């Protein structure tokens, strides 16, 4: 059902790796997903993947303050930074040498739009078609794509001040999981009153690593951008026996949530970013 749609999405859905190194020397990486929108390198992804970067900026200010105090008359009375303070941070945007510029993060909506610098349009053969939001209906078959289940070791080269991550073939490790559209969720508007907080709810959860990835229909048109997973209690409490002891279990249903493509298209239109829209006969939609 989704074979053709997945073949298209594999071209423009790419992994982003968020790597950090803390004061105690611990190096970790997490994976998310982004969607390349056009040949100019504009992308959309989830906003929360930048939380580590915000924390890094905060930690850097604190570390610099402590450094200044250590160099002052207080000297030895100044404590070291917290062991989990982030001292190095880096994003890897699907290709070496590529960095994100002109990024705008709508954290309350949980979306980010930005432009990849040093992007080569030849890297992506097919760009996404952003669906007509009026055609996203309850019960519609959908499929979510991203990069869960990736576990690898990241090193940090102290001399170069750079992270080293293993090579990956995104075409081989991308993972789809299917679902249906269950509901449209309206959470009102953002605090500044400028952005609609509208989402598409899905019958299966988004997995870690799929944040920022596309939720597509059977034709491959993007219906939403995956941002979160919510758990609902089923109010079933079966009693099970574990090692001779009776335990009451709570059962939950995990569902996914994606930013409605209607909102994404509106944000792109406001910034004059071109994209292919469902039903456009002329190809790319040019906003001047």
Language-model features: where?
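N-terminal activation segment of mature serine protease catalytic domains
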Residues: 1-36, 43-46, 109-112, 124-125, ...
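Conserved catalytic-core segment of clan PA serine endopeptidases
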Residues: 2-8, 22-26, 59-123, 130-134, ...
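Catalytic histidine site
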Residues: 12-76, 117-119, 216-219
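Terminal peptide-recognition signature
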Residues: 16, 34, 41, 45, ...
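Short, small/polar residue-rich loop motifs at catalytic or cofactor-binding pockets
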Residues: 28-31, 207-211
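Conserved active-site neighborhood of the chymotrypsin/trypsin-like protease fold
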Residues: 40-55, 92-154, 272-281
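Flexible, gly/ser-rich surface segments that form the specificity/activation loops bordering the active-site cleft
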Residues: 128-198, 206-210, 226-240
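C-terminal subregion of chymotrypsin/trypsin-like serine protease catalytic domains
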Residues: 217-288
């Amino acid at each position: 059902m989704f074979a053709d749609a997945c073949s298209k999405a594999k071209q423009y859905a790419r992994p982003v790796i968020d790597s950090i190194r803390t004061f105690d020397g611990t190096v970790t990486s997490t994976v998310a997903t982004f969607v390349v929108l056009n040949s100019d390198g504009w992308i959309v992804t989830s906003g929360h993947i930048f939380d580590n970067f915000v924390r890094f900026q905060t930690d850097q200010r604190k570390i610099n303050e402590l450094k200044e105090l250590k160099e002052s008359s207080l000297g030895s009375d100044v404590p070291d930074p917290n062991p989990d303070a982030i001292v190095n941070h880096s994003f890897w945007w699907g290709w070496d040498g590529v960095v994100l510029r002109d990024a705008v993060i709508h954290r309350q909506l949980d979306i980010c739009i930005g432009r990849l610098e040093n992007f080569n349009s030849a890297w992506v053969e097919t760009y996404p078609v952003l669906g007509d939001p009026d055609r996203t209906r309850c019960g519609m078959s959908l499929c979510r794509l991203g990069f869960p289940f990736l576990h690898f070791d990241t090193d940090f080269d102290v001399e170069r001040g750079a992270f080293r991550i293993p090579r990956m073939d995104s075409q081989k490790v991308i993972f789809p999981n299917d679902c249906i559209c269950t509901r449209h969720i309206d959470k009102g508007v953002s605090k500044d009153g400028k952005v609609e907080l509208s989402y598409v709810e899905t019958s299966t959860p988004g997995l870690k690593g799929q944040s920022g990835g596309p939720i597509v229909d059977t034709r491959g048109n993007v219906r939403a951008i995956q941002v979160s997973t919510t758990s609902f209690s089923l109010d079933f409490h079966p009693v099970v026996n574990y090692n001779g002891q009776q335990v009451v279990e709570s059962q939950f249903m995990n569902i996914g949530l994606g930013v409605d493509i209607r909102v994404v298209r509106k944000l792109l239109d406001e910034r004059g970013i071109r994209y292919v829209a469902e039903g456009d006969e002329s190809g790319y939609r040019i906003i001047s």
